[in-house]
């Protein structure tokens, strides 16, 4: 996040797929990114905390002391007289492409890639009303999973698996009512309605759906388990309730502009290849999936809880990254990995609507 490197000298080291990148905040307040390697002997220039974060006045190689300023300009080296072949005017750190959106910092090592906001397309306009740059990271969990990062990613961008994997959610989740959209070559969206009974469930009433939702989410216990007013659906009741809750939480009246979908539903955008922010006015999570070391059979999944806060209050500090064991949500991913390895050919058992996003991502992974 931009806020994690908010002051001059703050840096973040990002290691992925054999690349090491140093992202720094300069004295002028700009964000720069460089390959995290000394131009002399290739030694890593920066090593942050376990979460990759750190702070320094400049960029000095810990091996031989070659030194650059935060803006990447070469400042000198011990015994510089012994390096007459070094052209000071042409020995700056090579800059990588950096851009920001929604408070997130994006680095691209591909000089031919389109600009970030062009890449994100209509998603930029969609998120303008939700202002993710005005949120803080309340929780950051990172897990190592025994599956390829693409498999972990795919497991979280559709709701088709809910009936088999999370049947406890069906009394108040419209899993098969989900809407799937592919906006461009890189961005897709899933909207799964909440506060409705799944078509897979029989015999659950609207009032039972409300009670189950309130029980699971632990909402406003002092209100008890209310009776559903006559003529009002569970979705309407829960939507109105969340508008009141979040208006109080953010010290902002949402009733004049927020929809029930924006305070209730699971609205997930997936940005190829590995970034997936939830949307709306509720507390939202953002996912990031990355390869783990050099193994094609392991990955890391990051879950970041993004929270709003009243503008009248000081911005809370971002949470530090924590490692925790996998839970039920991820329990089936090793089986998927083994199953794919056993396949001789791609089966034809794909659901045209639910698997649309998966084909969308795969096509661009190989294309």
Features from the language model and the residues they span:
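Extracytoplasmic c-type cytochrome modules immediately beyond a signal peptide or single-pass transmembrane anchor
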Residues: 1-2
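Rieske [2Fe-2S] iron-sulfur-binding domain
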Residues: 5-111, 115-126
């Amino acid at each position: 996040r931009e806020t994690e490197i908010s002051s001059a000298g703050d840096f973040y080291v990002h290691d992925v797929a054999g690349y090491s990148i140093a992202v720094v905040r300069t004295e002028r307040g700009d964000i720069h990114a460089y390959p995290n390697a000394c131009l002399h002997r290739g030694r890593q220039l920066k090593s942050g905390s376990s979460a990759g974060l750190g702070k320094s006045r400049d960029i000095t190689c810990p091996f031989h002391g070659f030194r650059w300023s935060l803006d990447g300009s070469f400042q000198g080296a011990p015994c510089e007289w012994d390096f007459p072949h070094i052209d000071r005017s042409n020995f700056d750190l090579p800059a990588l492409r950096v851009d920001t959106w929604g408070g997130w910092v994006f680095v691209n090592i591909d000089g031919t890639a389109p600009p970030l906001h062009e890449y994100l397309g209509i998603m930029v306009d969609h998120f303008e009303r939700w202002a993710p740059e005005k949120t803080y990271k309340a929780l950051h969990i990172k897990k190592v999973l025994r599956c390829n990062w693409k498999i972990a990613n795919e497991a979280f961008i559709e709701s088709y698996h809910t009936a088999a994997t999370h049947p406890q959610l069906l009394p108040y989740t419209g899993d098969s009512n989900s809407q799937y959209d592919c906006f461009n070559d890189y961005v897709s969206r899933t909207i799964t309605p909440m506060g409705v009974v799944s078509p897979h469930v029989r015999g659950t009433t609207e009032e039972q759906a409300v009670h189950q939702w309130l029980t699971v989410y632990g909402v406003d216990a002092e209100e008890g388990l209310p009776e559903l007013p006559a003529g009002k659906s569970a979705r309407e009741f829960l939507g109105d309730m969340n508008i009141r809750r979040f208006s109080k939480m953010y010290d902002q009246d949402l009733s004049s502009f927020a929809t029930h979908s924006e305070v209730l539903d699971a609205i997930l955008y997936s940005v190829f290849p590995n970034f997936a922010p939830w949307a709306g006015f509720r507390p939202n999570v953002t996912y990031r999936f990355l390869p783990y070391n050099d193994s094609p059979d392991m990955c890391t999944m990051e879950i970041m809880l993004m929270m709003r806060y009243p503008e009248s209050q000081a911005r809370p500090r971002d949470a530090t990254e924590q490692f925790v064991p996998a839970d039920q949500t991820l329990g089936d991913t090793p089986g998927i990995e083994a199953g794919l390895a056993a396949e001789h050919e791609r089966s034809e058992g794909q659901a045209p609507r639910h698997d649309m996003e998966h084909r969308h991502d795969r096509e661009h992974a190989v294309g």
